């Protein structure tokens, strides 16, 4: 357990150091694109390593990114906005690198104290990429993907269109993928059952506009 804590702390420290290095290096325009790709690949690898700690969530972020891109395209978003939500999907759970495995992989219900710790992951993730110019637009998506349309989400209790449109799409994609994959405490739900649940919580947990766009893409086979 002590080793695990040390590794987690060192990983967070490395990410913050890399972020600072990247900010200083932007003065050299020739290196910008290479550095951008290298840094993004580094934090994506860290995000993947978080999922690798739990076989039930392996591939989750990539699927959330793919679903989010489809919904954004359904809504007619620009190529640039679709690229940004792709990044947001890939990195939305990055902050879980700072959450203890005993909480991440707990097979049963979290205690109130454990849930409060889990609720910190959007803030941790947004802080890791804060100040990186090319990822700056993605920060609110990561911070807001657990906000609810009715204002009862976290970490800030934002409501309705006070949540970024990207955060609202990520919430739909995240919910659908969570329901349609196995978890320690239940088997995956059928896609139709998950779709019905999204429709049921549209207007409370989720943005109805985003759920409608998701349903249209799902019915036409763009989302499996």
Where are these regions (language model features)?
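Metal-dependent catalytic cores of enzymes that make or break cyclic nucleotides
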Residues: 9, 33, 40, 44-224
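Sensory beta-strand/linker motifs that couple input domains to effectors
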Residues: 1, 24, 181
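Surface-exposed, flexible loop/turn segments at secondary-structure boundaries
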Residues: 3-4, 184
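PAS/PAC or PAS-like capping segment
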Residues: 2-3, 176
């Amino acid at each position: 357990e002590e080793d695990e804590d040390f590794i987690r702390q060192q990983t967070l420290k490395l990410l913050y150091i890399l972020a600072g290095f990247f900010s200083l290096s932007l003065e050299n325009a020739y290196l910008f694109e290479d550095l951008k790709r290298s840094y993004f690949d580094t934090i994506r690898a860290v995000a993947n390593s978080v999922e690798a700690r739990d076989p039930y969530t392996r591939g989750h972020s990539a699927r959330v990114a793919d679903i989010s891109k489809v919904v954004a395209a359904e809504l007619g978003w620009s190529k640039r906005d679709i690229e940004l939500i792709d990044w947001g999907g890939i990195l939305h759970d990055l902050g879980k690198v700072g959450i203890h495995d005993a909480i991440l992989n707990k097979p049963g219900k979290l205690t109130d104290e454990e849930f409060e710790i889990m609720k910190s992951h959007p803030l941790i993730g947004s802080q890791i990429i804060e100040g990186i110019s090319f990822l700056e637009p993605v920060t609110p998506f990561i911070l807001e993907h657990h906000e609810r349309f009715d204002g009862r989400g976290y970490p800030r209790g934002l409501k309705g269109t006070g949540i970024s449109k990207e955060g609202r799409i990520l919430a739909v994609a995240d919910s659908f993928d969570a329901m349609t994959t196995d978890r320690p405490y239940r088997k995956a739900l059928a896609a139709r059952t998950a779709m019905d649940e999204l429709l049921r919580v549209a207007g409370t947990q989720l943005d109805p506009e985003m759920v409608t766009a998701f349903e249209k893409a799902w019915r036409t086979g763009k989302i499996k």
